[in-house]
């Protein structure tokens, strides 16, 4: 479980399960040599995209500008799922994209503080690894995305084929 400090105390998402104080998510972590971190970051993003494709949820990928990155991240992507039932972010019509995943390349920020190192075979020295993380699914938000994108005319929800084997 994760906890959000401000949790519905202000802003536009104070009702429902879109933005709650306590939420669950499945996260991926990688520890790699510095020269491999760029490629690993793209690999984590590709896993997140494959999952969205498997569910048939429309989405977009945003590369976050440096001014919006947290102090630890050197590069970050967000995946936003299309939520057709939400009010439009432009104020006209229905539907908007909302973040369901992110992946960050934190380079040495965390490993230096935690003293996580590997022995560099070229130098024989212990050097900091690069750390990366990516959200596989933010559970509540993915439930919203599935419900809104898979609702049938009669109000029922058609479970995506990729999940059918897990539902009884």
Where are these regions (language model features)?
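TRNA-recognition modules of translation machinery and tRNA-sensing kinases, especially anticodon-binding
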Residues: 1-168
